[in-house]
């Protein structure tokens, strides 16, 4: 019986080990895609300060964005891919479709928050993006941006603390008090 039971248990356990190795490899590839996307964007932002052509910017921006999209397709239940894409489209998309992409950025940050309701970085960036968008004073975007920054600030997210300290006058004028 022992001779039969041990190989049977080993066969049952083997797929778990194989799946764990596959998942680990998938996770490493996922993180690599996100990192590559951010690296392309960092390089692009530095060169944008030196004013490259719009076509060149969009070509390289698309490559960075594709890295985030590939990461989301690979592991759609992970928050990092949505933060990556939200950051890309929300803050760095240029041209006439910028406002539409900012709204997509808000949706991606919201998706990351739905995956992890305590993801302070997503709250922070959704708040910053909301405040940076053209909006009406007192709009729903305005109110949500204030709530998001407050959540990150009250939970000691360093960037939110710095933002609040630097923009107290703006926040007060926008009825976003701390």
Regions found by a protein language model. Name each.
Residues 78, 119, 157-159:
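Residue-level recognition of tetratricopeptide repeat
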Residues 56-66, 95-111, 135-148:
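Structural signature of tandem alpha-helical TPR/SEL1-like repeats
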Residues 81, 122, 160-162:
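TPR alpha-solenoid repeat register
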Residues 37, 42-53, 86, 91-97, ...:
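Short coil/turn linking the two alpha-helices of tandem helical-hairpin repeats
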Residues 71, 111-112, 151-152:
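Canonical positions in the second alpha-helix
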Residues 24-28, 140-178:
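Terminal, low-structured helical/coil segments at or just beyond the last alpha-helical repeat
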């Amino acid at each position: 019986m022992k001779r039969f039971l041990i190989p049977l248990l080993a066969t049952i356990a083997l797929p778990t080990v194989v799946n764990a190795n596959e998942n680990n490899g998938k996770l490493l590839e996922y993180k690599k895609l996100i990192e590559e996307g951010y690296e392309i964007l960092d390089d692009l932002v530095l060169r944008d300060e030196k004013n490259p052509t719009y076509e060149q910017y969009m070509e390289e921006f698309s490559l960075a964005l594709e890295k985030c999209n590939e990461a989301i397709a690979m592991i759609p239940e992970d928050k990092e891919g949505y933060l990556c894409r939200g950051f890309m489209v929300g803050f760095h998309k240029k041209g006439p479709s910028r406002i539409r992409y900012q709204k997509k950025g808000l949706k991606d940050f919201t998706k990351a928050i739905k995956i992890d309701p305590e993801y302070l970085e997503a709250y922070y960036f959704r708040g910053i993006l909301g405040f940076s968008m053209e909006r009406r004073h007192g709009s729903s975007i305005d109110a949500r941006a204030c709530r998001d920054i407050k959540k990150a600030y009250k939970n000691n997210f360093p960037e939110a603390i710095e933002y609040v300290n630097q923009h107290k006058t703006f926040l007060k004028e926008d009825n976003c008090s701390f």
